[in-house]
């Protein structure tokens, strides 16, 4: 079972937090800090798996760093570490496809879409889908279509304003 999913930047700011077990909010905040501290202080050559007792007894923290972001899954002992690493890879590739090279700002300003993509991959702590194409297709069908404005672009408005004077 997957207990929680986090995305942190390299400064420790959580960009996505999703708990699949009921945990008091004050404890959640402490867990987020503890997990970031455990992951961020490891050398780059260290293994991407950590044994932990932070959530629901004995569990594992499995993470992967991409540029300035840490993608972290907290799972029970029944989950395959390599399977979760692959799942993180699939999740990141789905984000990349949906946002054309996802960056930290996408995580900040499009958090609802990020949660929708995660919901296509994991629900209730269980893995739902690992097929990248299916995840992207389902997520794109859920994302709101942005409407084009009929208003004049700002640059045209500014130039027409300047010609009047």
Swiss-Prot record:
Any Gene Ontology CC annotation: Golgi apparatus
Lineage top rank: taxon: Eukaryota
UniProt keyword annotations, A-Z: Cytoplasmic vesicle, Golgi apparatus, Membrane, Protein transport, Transport
GO process terms (BP): Golgi to vacuole transport; intracellular protein transport; vesicle-mediated transport
Gene3D superfamilies named among the record's database cross-references: 3.30.450.60
Protein transport is among the record's keywords: yes
Pfam families for this protein: Clat_adaptor_s
Compartments, as annotated in UniProt: Golgi apparatus; Cytoplasmic vesicle membrane
InterPro entries membership: AP_complex_ssu (IPR016635), AP_mu_sigma_su (IPR022775), Clathrin_sm-chain_CS (IPR000804), Longin-like_dom_sf (IPR011012)
Membrane topology per record: Peripheral membrane protein
Family classification: Belongs to the adaptor complexes small subunit family.
Subunit text: Adaptor protein complex 3 (AP-3) is a heterotetramer composed of 2 large adaptins (apl5 and apl6), a medium adaptin (apm3) and a small adaptin (aps3).
Role played: Part of the AP-3 complex, an adaptor-related complex which is not clathrin-associated. The complex is associated with the Golgi region as well as more peripheral structures. It facilitates the budding of vesicles from the Golgi membrane and may be directly involved in trafficking to the vacuole.
Name this polypeptide is given: AP-3 complex subunit sigma
Organism: Schizosaccharomyces pombe (strain 972 / ATCC 24843) (Fission yeast)
Lineage, broadest ranks: Eukaryota, Fungi, Dikarya, Ascomycota, Taphrinomycotina
């Amino acid at each position: 079972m997957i207990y929680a999913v986090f995305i942190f930047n390299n400064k420790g700011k959580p960009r996505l937090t999703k708990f699949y077990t009921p945990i008091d909010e004050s404890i959640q905040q402490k867990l987020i800090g503890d997990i970031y501290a455990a992951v961020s202080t490891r050398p780059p050559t260290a293994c991407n798996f950590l044994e932990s007792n932070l959530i629901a007894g004995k569990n594992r923290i499995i993470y992967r760093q991409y540029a300035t972001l840490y993608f972290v899954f907290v799972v029970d002992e029944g989950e395959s570490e390599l399977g979760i690493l692959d799942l993180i890879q699939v999740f990141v590739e789905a984000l990349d496809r949906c946002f054309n090279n996802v960056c930290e700002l996408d995580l900040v300003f499009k958090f609802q879409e990020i949660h929708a993509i995660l919901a296509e991959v994991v629900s209730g702590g269980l893995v739902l889908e690992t097929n990248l194409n299916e995840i992207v297709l389902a997520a794109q069908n859920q994302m709101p279509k942005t409407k084009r404005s009929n208003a004049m672009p700002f640059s045209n408005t500014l130039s027409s304003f300047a010609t009047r004077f």
